[in-house]
Amino acid sequence: MRQFNLSGKHAVVTGGCSGIGNSIARTFIENKAYVHILDLDENQGQSVIESLGSDKASFHFCDVRDQAKVHNVFQSIAKDHPVDILVNNAGIANIGKVENTTEDDLDHVYAVNIKGVYNCLHACISIMKSNGGGVILNMASIAASAGLPDRFAYSMSKGAVVSMTLSVAQDYLGDNIRCNSISPARIHTPFVDGFISKNYPGKEKEMFEELSKTQPIGRMGKPEEVASLALFLCSDEAAFITGVDYPIDGGFTTLNT
């Protein structure tokens, strides 16, 4: 029997057009799942679906900050398909200490990274319950447990994601719903390149090397490596695992001294 076989499963991946979310979507498809990608970029979304295959994936425009629209998207999916897997991957970053994090900064991070996850959970749980169960995977960060400099709002938001993971795992044990989270360190994606360019203009190469070295293993992670862990946690091989946050961090949280 093939391990990590998601044949017949329908997975929802938020933020699935690029980076980690896109790698997760591709990995799930390679392992026979059908993937519903939720994202904000319609043009990119259609391009992604063309590359994945319209018989293997579909794109749904969705702003995870808007609860009513999130519910509408999930209900439209659930009319024809079960939601077996939810990957809450959509998120944004923010640089700043508490004193230079504005109220608008905090509200924006909250709206996407916390309320966005809540909205998708809120829309999905009842669907999974009616279908006899499911698997939820939330994308957290090492920022939830390590004191990263200049990441006040972001760290707060990812700490909330880990807390939501534990609450959902506990509350829905009796409904056959598993819930875990992944906490990556720095993963090399186009988002990271853009983030460095925006915040460290003229110092891109220097900052990339500096950020890479913060992982004791000596490099940033690859989206495909996160996707492989996501595949395991969402597969039947992980049926005995719930309420756990998994660091994938090149030794960041345990080997940095």
Regions found by a protein language model. Name each.
Residues 121, 157, 165:
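Active-site helix of classical SDR
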Residues 141:
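Residue(s) in the substrate-gating loop at a strand-loop-helix junction
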Residues 2, 146, 231, 242-257:
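Short C-terminal tail/terminal secondary-structure segment
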Residues 126, 170-174, 239:
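Alpha-helical segment proximal to the catalytic Tyr-Lys
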